[in-house]
Amino acid sequence: MAGPRPERHVLDNPALASLTGPHAHFAERRGRVLRYPVDVSPWLGLPDEPDADDWADLAALVGPGEEAPLAGFRGRVPDGWEVTFDIAGVQLVDNGIAAAPDAEAVRLGPEDVPEMLDLVERTRPGPFLPRTVELGTYLGIRRGGALVAMAGERLHPPGWTEISAVCTDPEFRGEGLAGRLVLAVAHGIRERGETPFLHTGAGNTNAIRLYEALGFRLRRTTRFLAARVPEHVPDGRHVGV
């Protein structure tokens, strides 16, 4: 007889844990499926083992023909869903990093979003949208008045906060700005009694080396997946009615 399943950790499904926890005020819900507003974050919270009803709810929430990001999902998408993006990723957690404030770092807010979007467009650290800054603290470094590096907070499972949007203008790379900002953001997270974590692509060896040098350790491999919603998704709730 099979024993009990091991208890799931909140970092195993961090988007769902965020949207049912500290970020619940952002959540748009249909059934057991949750999402952030489209101008805040693309991430969706899908149950660990979604059934046909969950996929139907996901389709209704996202819309036919639209792309559904399913970061961390390890299962198989249903027939008819077109996988549009699928790469290996890693999740790293604080393992004694030397978190510290940075004298040059400044708090970024809504008035800085145009510059933040421009920096993200030029450096491609991952999704950053007009209201992503509302998810937590974002810090930046300016040179000559221009924003040249930034990092901030994204997913927020209970007790944990993800560091994201870590990027540096190509002209200012090699000065250690990204590492300094990661440590500064981590300091704020630690001050709240929470633990920093982050994600990156498994092939992004430079970023992984940087994070490990700062004191992060690999917790698990993961998957960055997206699938296109088909035009029609059966809803199991209506079968036999």
Regions picked out by a protein language model, each given a short descriptive name:
Residues 44-50, 166-173:
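A short, internal acetyl-CoA/4′-phosphopantetheine-binding micro-motif in the GNAT/acyltransferase core
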Residues 1-11, 95-126, 232-241:
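Short amphipathic alpha-helix that is part of the acyltransferase structural core
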Residues 1-77:
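N-terminal charged segments
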Residues 76-81, 179, 202-220, 228:
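Conserved active-site alpha-helix within GNAT-family acetyltransferase domains
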